[in-house]
Structures are given as C-alpha cells and as structure tokens.
C-alpha cells in the first residue's frame, strides 16, 4: 500500500488489474482528455510504462481501491510532465464511470499530494 484515506487505499497497479484498468482506458468518456479511448496496443504500452516508472522513479499512477469492497475503481498518482521546457510533477487520475461523482478522485488526489510532500520531498 502506498497511502490511504478514509474510504480508499492506493497501491501499485499489477497485471491482475489489467482488465479493470483496460476498461477505463478504453472508455471514450473516461479518456476525453486523451483524445479518445486507447487501443489494445496502447493499453499494453500504458501498463509497460507504469511498470517502468515504478522501477525507475518509485512512483506513477496507482490503483485506487475501495476499502469497503477491495474493488479497484480507478487510478491516481504522480506523473512527470513537460511544461514550457520544465519537468513538473502533476497529479493525474482516471476512474471507472460507475464511480464518478462520489468524491473519490478528489480524495485520492489529496492523498497523492500529501504523499508527494511528506514522502518524496
């Protein structure tokens, strides 16, 4: 486990999560900021990138799991982005549409922010 909140815990994504995460990545609505749903090949590449980032950086997007049911409902974590020629850390998230509008994204993002400042700083 990476971090937790009252309702959620965040952990590294594993191959066992592939189908759940692929469902999110292949949902046009969930992927609106990425110009649409991912192909099977893009999903596989996404997973490969996550595993590489865990090994090289020690962080990336993590599985967001409901404590009550142990169900993976999305992914949230820290990513590095290029902004005006500078590398900056951002919090990103993607959730299964069935779990939108319940405050999970905000809750997970706040936990990631705390983790970034308390653990990675």
Task: Report each predicted region and the residues it spans.
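GNAT-family acyltransferases
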Residues: 1-98, 111, 115, 119
